[in-house]
Amino acid sequence: MRDRLILLPGWGLGVSPLEPLAAALRGLDEHFRVEIEPLPVLASTTLQDWLDELDATLPDNVWLGGWSLGGMLATELAARRGERCCGLVTLASNPSFVSRDDWTSGMPAATFELFLGGFREAPNTTLKRFCLLCSQGSAEPRALASQLLGGAPKAQPDILLAGLELLGKLDTRSALQAFNGPQLHLFAGLDGLVPVQAASDVLALLPDVEVGLIEQACHAFLLEAPHELAAAIQGFLHESGDD
């Protein structure tokens, strides 16, 4: 089913941010199936539990993709499935959201720990702050943050906390290197959560994959530039289909 793409959303904000991109992709090719699958509702912080849930839910032999945490999970699932996955598309998705000694293009660990502590203390306030960080770099950050927050589902704090802790633990570099299918990784030049250096570092890690940069865009570039993203994804899918 090379004409089918499953997209996974990022942390805490539900499927709404991906809907404009899905609509733009369908508009470019009415025969191409684009579906958005919600993240698993799990209180576990163990990656295997999340992958087991996704592997049981999502069809085989499709393209896998996702935004931020969703892209990281799509990467891990693609590596698990191998030839049962047509290819991988990630959007503003850092192989390691948090900086490590050998991956410095992430959020400083101390900053992430403060954010995690803030969520434990005041989840609603911290989610609002997260929306502002997602929209940092946008021409209208507050309006975009309000749109993100307005579309977010009412999730239980313990479920959100588990997802946030997983985000802080994940390091998908081995999975990226293990997956031999076609890969496209798109980044935003004004991203307040994923440093732009991550794009160069991904290309250095994976010299044979496609890496793109939407320069004047924030982390929530799904809402800022859905048609530009859709055009890049469609071009990549067509090229991969011709190989």
PLM regions and their residue ranges:
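Conserved HGGG/HGGXW glycine-rich cap/lid loop of the alpha/beta-hydrolase fold
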Residues: M1-L47
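The conserved beta1-alpha1 loop
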Residues: L8-W11, W67, F187-A188
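Conserved alpha/beta-hydrolase "acid-adjacent" motif
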Residues: S16, G192-A198
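Gly/Ala-rich beta-loop-alpha elbow adjacent to hydrolase catalytic centers
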Residues: G66-G70, A74
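Flexible "cap/lid" loop of the alpha/beta hydrolase fold
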Residues: C85-G118, I159-A162
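Conserved alpha/beta-hydrolase catalytic His-Asp/Glu region
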Residues: R120-L170, S174-A175
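Short beta-strand/loop motif that positions the catalytic acidic residue
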Residues: F179, H185-F187, D191
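Catalytic histidine-centered segment of alpha/beta-hydrolase-like enzymes
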Residues: A217-A230
